[in-house]
């Protein structure tokens, strides 16, 4: 969506080291004081008679930042939308009494959980409530979330034969294929409440606090974007090979080196699967998306560059083909990883519009590393950096 944006000039990224740490957010490519507005006279040029502005309404802060522009406020959201800090979330899960993956495939439940942080805190985006294991389930893979453990696979995939059997499956072909429609319905329900450039959000039946949160979130744009997400190919592959969470991902890294052909088939399948999962959310109305790589930090830069990055690029390419009915365009994409300070340049080169970082790297250092990785591309928006201990 086009908008009015006054020009600014970029200053040295070295000033970023004085930037304060913010919460989970996307910031423009030059954070804090490193973007300065041109003279106010230019504002008059963008105004019509009697001071009325010309052109369409402004974009939400998240979309402004992802486009590399400096928004009026730093967009903030819950990185993990299933926020156990929210009493209404805990109460809802207790009442529903269903396993995590089943909750993700219940449109009413998924939509309600997605909306809770926006209503309570007025955050700038609603991360769609789901799990990175959902696309595996929707391809007929036996997987469950065990309390205190995490994702557990019924049958790990560790041989060429097992990989061959797995990659014959397709997104939406499994016994839970109707779950694809459930995801689409849940996203549409969220968009109805959060609004879009075409229609304001529905507020009937909500508490005063919830309406206030939604109004703050919508801001001057008048609507709040839904953020789609999916697990990166390496993270999905690591779970598939290990069978459960692992500290060192030894089995996955062994397959990567001992059987590169099977690794290629596995990663290609994971990339297309998670890309289509994200695309499904976008086609239903999500306006932006994030590829989430929980385990890439366990890899060396060389291993990541040669055996992982091409597949992350493929997943992003698949996701980028989807057009959001909310904005009428492809969703901007964030590539986030944990413990990936040494990989930031490679993550950017995979093709995302912004790169996410965890608390183990300063924002200024991340911005400089990303700029050095591709000087011709210019500065890159950066997201994240809040220490979970806070």
Residue map of PLM features:
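Alpha/beta enzyme core
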Residues: 246-289, 301, 309, 313-321, ...
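Catalytic-face loop-and-helix region of soluble metabolic enzyme cores
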Residues: 321-390
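Active-site-proximal loop/short-helix segments
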Residues: 132-143, 223, 227-253, 280-307
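N-terminal basic, low-complexity leaders that serve as flexible interaction/assembly modules and, when applicable
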Residues: 6, 26-138, 143, 196-199, ...
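Alpha-helix-loop-beta-strand connector modules within alpha/beta enzyme cores
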Residues: 181-197, 221, 302-329, 368-370, ...
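Active-site beta-loop-alpha junctions enriched in small/polar residues
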Residues: 79-81, 131, 229-233, 294-296, ...
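Active-site-proximal, glycine-rich beta->alpha crossover segments in alpha/beta enzymes
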Residues: 144-277
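Structural preference for beta-strand elements that scaffold enzyme active sites
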Residues: 71, 77, 125-127, 225-227, ...
